[in-house]
Amino acid sequence: MKKATKYFYKRIRIKKETSSTEEEAKYEIEFIERSFSFDDYKSRTFQLFEADFDQTLRVFHLQGIEPCNWVRVKDYEIDSGVDTRNQINIMCDYREIHPAPEYTSLAPGILLSYDIETFSSDYVSFPQAEKDGDEIVQIGAVAYHFSSPEPIIKYLAVLDTCDDIDGVVVERFESEEELLIGWAEFLSKLQPDIITGYNIFGFDDDYIMKRVTKHYLWNEFSCYNRIISEPVRLSMKKLGSSALGDNIFKVITSSGSTSFDLLLHIRNEFKFASYKLDDVAYELV
């Protein structure tokens, strides 16, 4: 079977590379979708889909599932083969996942908003993550349950000393390395479902991961990933639209949580002369 599979992929790759006209492309689609027959193996058919179409969205469409709503899984198995920080891991066929419209309450997920403060070692230029002395000196965060306006916790990780602040959990660290690890451990305990902030895709996420890389802290910083064996990564995402233009965003990706940059929403929904945080807050708050 291994030999036949190799031949099949080689055949498809050659035909894809030699396609130059619409007529040729049409023929190749028909060619692929017809059944294949290899020596000593049964014939198989292959259905084609858009390669760039997200598979999660495809499941939503096929099963009639609304994003962020409850679902019911009829037949599943407990998956003990993967080491995670989840309460339960299951395996099932996607056809066993069905919408549960009778449940209308919000899930008790956790939303965390964060912001970093950085230091310029030359006191003049804007902080550069590549410079040794341009450290992260503070990471502040506030977390909520989806269904409640009252914060679960207000948190501040600070480099060096800081006075106590009423209603805020303040953790003090002697080095930037300890601060970054402390921040990751805080996320590991809280396990937020959505992580947000203002311009985090344009500054905060990238700055944090560059400092993590500078201190060789990849393993330690990945301690909050839901799937323990997977590292936290910085992903590059390109987005082009008439409202936002062409942009490249740098996003910290971790299993089990979704990141959302509030700046993108503000730029898409409101027309302001300036999108600096202070100016936007003046307009909206």
List the model feature ranges, each with a label.
Residues M1-L263, N268-V285:
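The two-metal-ion catalytic cores of nucleic-acid processing enzymes
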